[in-house]
Amino acid sequence: MGKERTAAITRVVVPLAHGFEEIETVTVVDILRRAGISVTVAGVETGSPPGAIEGRTGIRLVPDLSIAGVQASDFDMIVLPGGLKGAQTLQKDTRVARLLRSLQDNDRYIAAICAAPTVLASHGMIAGRRLTSHPSVKDQLAGAIYDEQRVVVDGRLVTSRGPGTAMEFALVLVEILEGKQKVEEVKQEVLARL
């Protein structure tokens, strides 16, 4: 797992909608940025520039830009945060659907945590794929090979279960994108014992 380090900066996009799960979102964005990965948080709500987007517990985040300004060719990975309401909004957003399809068609990584694998299911992207999710949405993932591991990697699809697995999920993403040494550096910096 992981790629050889190159001079190119790895780029990740994180779409954000009202009702996102804060722990999952902030943990992933923070850990990836600590690893030197360029992370763009793209708001799917209306408005330009996008205003603050409220998470499921009321914490507000301001996206870097609107999803309308995102080009799939600019990114190596997309990470879909959970939070049921946020995931439901991502399911309905045609721009997110186009972005997912383009990334998949170009053999890029797709990652989803908690309720977010339902976004992939709603776009017919999980049939025969091994994945996991928050237990509350398991029944919405028909056609997938469901696995209860905390983080599941199936080719270029990475899924995880929920807020309590966010750090492990983020570190697996770092390993995939930047290698094991970078994971160890980040773990040492944040005092992670995973």
Describe the predicted segments one by one.
Residues 153:
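Cytochrome P450 catalytic-domain "roof"
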Residues 135-137:
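Long, charge-patterned amphipathic alpha-helical coiled-coil/hairpin "stalk" segments used as oligomerization
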